[in-house]
């Protein structure tokens, strides 16, 4: 099926040949949709206040207001809120270390009622005061779905938590030694007390509130208003007996008798024995009894003994209670009943199998007598030690489950609750009702009786996602709740004092709650910005950890495991290795959230075996009701499922069904995996564990200097790059007017330009910006002046993108062969050419900060005047003491000069005299300058100076501000120039050929305006021309107004920018000035760096070999990387081998295209070859859309290799790869390269001897990545450094400038060698013998190389610890 849609700007330059068997039915949705939508719904900033729905901020305000005073005569009502424009934009916040946020202002009314006129029914308003009150700052989300908090980019990860509602489960027989299943139920609200019900091993049912002490469930049932009779009536059916003088008559109910063993002869009306004693009653027996018309069965006396009375039996004459409900019948009681003339007796019906007497037994151990007593018992359990007054008891019980302020089931909870207990409606009150509690107990008893099934808590229908918006709303609500208490206290004063709303509301608690959440919550994380893929994955992450979630230690295997409901919702592959495995997941490619927060995945509807284009999103619960075919099921031309049996899923199980039973079908084979996993080609051929590593390591790939598209991709590369926001896309279509390295200017198409607005889009590109991981964020334009663009076209590449596709590595020529042991155990051998060509060179940007503080001894000063430094050491600093931009610095170089006042020392008279003469002040300050760390070097690329308000700026700070303003003015002038040029072009088109009523240069009335006349008049006088047509005159006037408006807005923008730059900066307390220096460090590939492919095939560079020593092919092409073939079979990641073959084919085709271009072949020949590549196999491409020039441009782009897409689970087959290899390497070319018959292997030659290797080697191109584990960051050496305070042993780790640990095993090794002196040295002077090491320094200074080992400090610590246990221990010195 050919691609019918038109190609985008970048696709016209390079089309990726796809092997997908069919076109995607559904485009991959915008990947950051979940984050963006959730926060938009939270803020509702663009919705008019009256139209805002009750969610997010609006819901938080509605829940807190109105606040009523204790006496009820003052009330504070919420009217609406609005969000102010943020003071600084995203870039400014990042530079200045601020939070990108917007102030919330709420309009509230203070209503005071008149005490005298008001009655209890109606209140008379005395006074209303309305005012806007500041309610804290809410951080805003950037376009890329992140937040800027204190200048750093952060992500709020969504949380997967157990949905509110009711859950039934059992302990799987683990609690009791007999293995008996103990059933339990739990009602979980969104906020409020948890209510648990549980059976104990004796089958008594208990409840507990908030996991406190358990109590019999009948106490709760009595507390909600049931008496013992009604409790029994709710849970049991009755057996009706008629008492006789001896024995009784039992009302015959066939179902209850069936299956029981007769304890006596059962006879019919005629006295015929139907069932003999000790025989089991069968269906045949009950049928006989029915046919004989039996209504009652005679039973002996002992059949009644032990039965339980269903209701109170009262003596009709005296009113005395003869037997209470739930009392067991005894001989004495029967005698008493007969004596009182009781004939009809109702007892509860129970049996061992499916009608246990659990509630009856529970009622028997319950000592409470009535509703109030039951509530007192609950009060005592909740508040032990407090006196239970009647008001307190009733209030507590109401607050537990019935008060909307303290208990909220939420919409989701109510929907899940109703669904579970079998109600049809999805809505209802947000608090519990008595019926709800009763229904749950009934279901739990039914479960114990063997009816129904328990819930699976790992089912995604029972786990929901809490997004950014919901988490932020909860925090805001917390802040408002704190305010509510304070306001309530003060509202009473508003009657007497003339207080306004802002006097009553203090916004600090709100700000504190939000600040704490966005800055320090477990779910607010420092954004992983290593590359675009890391960024996008972080925002799509779903975590089960965090507040209200699980903890690593307590999470069992089941929660972490892949569940059938993960299909199409959560990726089964991408999850971290280590303690968080399975707790942190990634959203699948097409997944989205529904209104309740459950994850849904799309399916195509199938009607009578025919697959339609209708798409339904199903949640995990809905999916269980349908039979769903796989995406790769074969269809005929009409879209019908073919074959007798179709592979499908029913209730999560894979099965084969007939086509007519299928109800839905997957939309895409890639639907089950996440973005990172969907970028791994041939994922279907990799072992899951290795695929997991591959997906995770793709996120750690460092952006290299020149990104290169993957030769073998999956087709998701373009989507991921655009959605990550790293590339720049055109907001509107148009023509490129101007391009340079920092800016792209696009003149917008007339049909897309908004009337009266400037028809120009200006895109400022990011240059050398530091990411959170110190990698380089850098954008480069890929358009030329005059290029035509459509909306959404990629116009500039970012870090790790190439022509709008994610490109996290480089395509390397790989040979799978051992090479002198240098690729033993996953080591990697690399050609020197790779390093020389800077293929894996990356730029890292480090930020170094120095602050000048106000100390007790005086202010620190940033200055060039530093004591004891030579002029040579200061020659790179300017007069303000700050290094120049562009300086190349080495370890130890001074970047910013700073001096700190020292404490005054007493001076001798001579020193005083000298200081008086020479005015020397060097002795009272110490040098605390910012210097380059050991082990790092680089180029200074930027300096930022921040000065507190009221402190005078130095020259450097002023110069930075001037440069920034100059740049901004230049930007505005350019914009104005383009806007004016554009406006005058439009005017020229508008006026040419029109008749004028007059104008400049004495233009006569009725003259036709031509281009020559317009050229003779200065452009600014064109507005003075008076066209005859009214409409033209109006258009001319509107253009003039728009231009003037633009000029005015530009002047305002410049003024605002100047104001922002010249105002003082917000700095931490006590800081007067802060200087940030940015160093760019170039990191070349070197031995020790970690590298990996995309299939989990990771390794460390062991050696960089001269290119002439590398194995080479028959035509002289040397390999770039040599990998160990033993790394493939045991790891079972065969995907890498298929990638190598297909990459080899792509490279060969590129070479053939290059040859055609070199011999200047005709375009028709090129077209024919491209048709062969793109349209012989896999998805067809419509190359007729491209002009000859575009074909040539595309061919030039393809000379480096034809890129392929092998979509996940729908990739290239072996046959297709073979066909592509044959197309790429005709016989003559294959022979020249020394390829085998299959073209997948080649005979290589040893670079050192020139001899041919005995066997052919697998060669080809693989996309190989350099990971962010660079040896430069890990290398570290210590001479002397910091020691631990208690043990006096050296600290560990590079960050602490620590030493190497000489551990237990290393000690054993030295013991085994008998190296006693080395061992003594290691354990004493090189570790924690304080006197010993001081002596060693002395000896070294003296030139003596001797050690005197003493007592290790850790021994003293041990002695002290033993003494702390009360054992006296002393060291005897002999």
From Swiss-Prot:
Gene3D superfamilies in alphabetical order: 2.40.50.100, 2.40.50.150, 3.90.1100.10, DNA-directed RNA polymerase, beta subunit, external 1 domain, DNA-directed RNA polymerase, subunit 2, domain 6, RNA polymerase alpha subunit dimerisation domain, RNA polymerase Rpb2, domain 2
UniProt GO BP: DNA-templated transcription
EC top class, as a word: transferase
Coiled coil: none
Tree of life domain: Bacteria
Catalytic activity reported: RNA(n) + a ribonucleoside 5'-triphosphate = RNA(n+1) + diphosphate
Keywords assigned: DNA-directed RNA polymerase, Nucleotidyltransferase, Transcription, Transferase
One annotated GO molecular function: ribonucleoside binding
InterPro entries linked to this entry: DNA-dir_RNA_pol_bsu_ext_1_sf (IPR042107), DNA-dir_RNA_pol_bsu_external_1 (IPR019462), DNA-dir_RNA_pol_su2 (IPR015712), DNA-dir_RNAP_su2_dom (IPR007120), DNA-dir_RNAP_su2_hyb_sf (IPR037033), RNA_pol_bsu_bac (IPR010243), RNA_pol_bsu_CS (IPR007121), RNA_pol_bsu_protrusion (IPR007644)
EC number from the UniProt entry: 2.7.7.6
NCBIfam families for the chain: PRK00405.1, rpoB
Family: Belongs to the RNA polymerase beta chain family.
Function (record text): DNA-dependent RNA polymerase catalyzes the transcription of DNA into RNA using the four ribonucleoside triphosphates as substrates.
Protein name as catalogued: DNA-directed RNA polymerase subunit beta
The organism of origin for this protein: Acidovorax sp. (strain JS42)
Lineage, top ranks: Bacteria, Pseudomonadati, Pseudomonadota, Betaproteobacteria, Burkholderiales
Originating gene: rpoB
